[in-house]
Amino acid sequence: MKIATYNVNGVNGRLPVLLRWLEENKPDVACLQELKAPHEKFPFQAIKGAGYNAIWHGQKSWNGVAILSKVGKIEEIKRALPGDEEDVQSRYIEANINGIRIVCLYLPNGNPAPGPKFDYKMGWFKRLQVHAKELYALNIPVVICGDYNVMPTELDVYKPERWVDDALFRPEVRAAFNELIAQGWTDAIRKLYPNDTIYTFFDYFRNAYVRNAGLRIDHFLLNPHLDKRLVAAGVDLNVRGWEKSSDHAPVWIELAD
């Protein structure tokens, strides 16, 4: 089973890129972030035409998450991260597909830091830690994937010295990610490639993609049920080079049946 995560940076504006990627790479499940579209503007018919069912949680102009599947019914569990009923940003959706609990998330950016946006990010992270612990306690396979807006280590960022005070790399943020790992979750990419330079995001400016000046901020966290089934993982870097592509590249894992 192949599961992918892709921050599409506007699902309608990048629809040709998304559909081409789905056709060429054929993930069984695809988790999308940054739809930047209200619920009624999600291109469901085009997605359906590509062979996928979908659930989504949209928001006008900002955020938005979706889960696509071509391998089974999508049973929606949640469409908001528990812990703050006043949080109306569309950043979280959770579902069961073929016996796997799949979480698709778009963690806040947090810049500028310090400030209210950074406080929101850290609060969101704390809520995620609480819910992740509950998910970990379930005796079922669970994956938490998406755009975490965190580079966990210096290996995950081009020229880390330039990012010391950024909300994606501040010590508090990296510590929060490591607290998730400490619960027992496996960072899928790092399990298979512990020492490789791997990036998933390349800024549109300064030819970042051409220079391989990137960040690794899109992650798969697996519980032990899925950790033992992990057979492959990677980044579809070539997609980032397509015309009118997102500034993220799709990331994927492959699980043994």
Predicted feature locations:
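Structured beta-strand-rich core segments of catalytic domains in phosphoester-bond hydrolases
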Residues: 35-38, 42-112
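Surface polyanion/phosphate-binding segment centered on an Asp-His-Pro turn
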Residues: 234-257
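Short, acidic/polar
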Residues: 12-23
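Active-site beta-strand/loop signature of hydrolases that rely on acidic residues for catalysis
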Residues: 3-7, 22-40, 102, 131-154, ...
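Surface-exposed cleft-lining segments at the edges of enzyme active sites
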Residues: 82-83, 108-125, 161-166
